[in-house]
Amino acid sequence: MKQILIIEDDTALNQGLCKALKTDSRKLISCETIKAARDQLLCGCPSLILLDINLPDGSGLDFLQELKRELPAIPIILLTANDTDLDIVRGLELGADDYITKPFSLSVLRARVNTQLRKAESLQAQTTEHVYR
């Protein structure tokens, strides 16, 4: 079962994301702070992370860099109100696999989440195949 970790401090949006992205083959884990996300990551690695930038206990961009150092294979999508070109470029250059600005379309979000999950699965399959050759 694929797990998606959502790190979003807006409780209503966090709950809405969980509802919108849940399927029979997905488990959604929601956190509202970086600390809660770190604690959750001790329990296991998700298949994908949705990460807000403006969090109450720190910068999502700083956490993004930490995550990419520790868990480079996990796709991370930034989901944020920071919508200038400079913000988007900075997020992508720091390692985000995608960048979605608020407000957003649920259908676009679902498509981007599905794309990142497919890419990660394909990469994992290629890596496994390479190891066993």
Named regions from a protein language model:
Residues L61-P72:
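Short amphipathic alpha-helix used as the core "switch/output" element in two-component signaling
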